């Protein structure tokens, strides 16, 4: 019995030692991976700040200067406050700058062109009241890293080129897709619209017994769309739902008054459809038109012109006959 106990004790000790060795190996591997990652990104601090302290990013890319202001996590374009920004793209810039390290520090060589005479990208970041300006030149032909200089520092540095990719956007590239209509398809209670032909169509949602159910309880009811004042004509509910989804859909671009939004140039002198959408919050007018460069939307109370896909226009310009069930 004693021999058996000693054997078990030895096995337990061996297992404990192996477990400790495995833990140490995993920890060492994690440390090596972290060190390798840090080495790849660089270890020479160029720009460092808490993301909570950031207030402004100004960058010039290919000659266009954009100034992004951060107010309590909401981004605004200083040059055009009406413009809807891609919040994710702005936050990616913050992440790239908040811990930007250089991989190498070099001495500039006479006669060498580092791309600073006409830099593709210049970034100025303001955080905690401190301003840092970085000028990015050309890429090293061997390593692919980009040359960078920091204002107030005569040294030349290189950074991983991937850290600057998030700034390769002009104004249009920073647009954040959203729904300017401001409602969901499920919120809509009534739709009334006039087509370019002059045809007027009015739709209203009602609650009806689902299928052949004859139980008068809420579980057997469903929302059914019909022509206003016409309870007998069946509509193609899928086409109606496509229309509701189109009315509440995201837009793909924006032309603000600051950009010279011109309704006439975008076809709003002869709109394809003028749609009044009623929800619990009230009635809003959406106008759709077609210009030489595509299809557009304007929303009541908003002076911007929004680019929409052609399929959206098709869905919201259906005639009464097209909506009637076969």
Placement of each model-derived feature along the sequence:
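Soluble, acidic/polar mature domains that operate outside membranes
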Residues: 1-326
């Amino acid at each position: 019995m004693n021999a058996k106990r000693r054997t078990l004790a030895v096995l337990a000790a061996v297992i404990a030692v192996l477990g400790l060795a495995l833990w140490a190996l995993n920890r060492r591997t994690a440390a090596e991976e972290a060190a390798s990652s840090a080495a790849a990104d660089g270890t020479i601090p160029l720009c460092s700040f808490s993301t909570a302290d950031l207030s402004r990013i100004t960058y010039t890319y290919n000659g266009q200067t954009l100034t992004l202001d951060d107010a309590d996590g909401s981004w605004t374009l200083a040059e055009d406050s009406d413009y809807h920004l891609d919040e994710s793209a702005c936050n990616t810039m913050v992440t790239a700058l908040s811990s930007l390290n250089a991989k190498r520090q070099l001495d500039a060589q006479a006669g060498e062109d580092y791309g600073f005479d006409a830099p593709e990208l210049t970034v100025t970041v303001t955080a905690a009241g401190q301003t840092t300006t970085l000028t990015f030149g050309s890429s090293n032909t061997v390593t692919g890293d980009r040359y960078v200089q920091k204002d107030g520092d005569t040294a030349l540095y290189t950074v991983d080129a991937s850290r600057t990719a998030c700034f390769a956007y002009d104004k249009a590239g920073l647009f954040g897709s959203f729904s300017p209509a401001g409602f969901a398809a499920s919120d809509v209670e009534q739709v009334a619209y006039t087509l370019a032909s002059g045809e007027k169509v009015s739709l209203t949602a009602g609650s009806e017994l689902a299928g052949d159910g004859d139980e008068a309880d809420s579980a057997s009811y469903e929302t059914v769309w019909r022509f206003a004042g016409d309870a007998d004509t069946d509509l193609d509910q899928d086409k109606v739902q496509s229309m509701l989804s189109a009315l509440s859909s995201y837009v793909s671009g924006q032309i603000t008054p600051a950009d010279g939004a011109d309704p006439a140039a975008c076809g709003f002198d002869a709109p394809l459809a003028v749609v009044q959408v009623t929800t619990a919050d009230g009635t809003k007018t959406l106008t759709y038109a077609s210009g030489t460069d595509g299809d557009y939307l304007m929303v009541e109370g908003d002076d911007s012109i929004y680019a929409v896909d052609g399929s959206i226009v098709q869905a919201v310009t259906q005639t009464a006959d097209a909506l009637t069930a076969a």
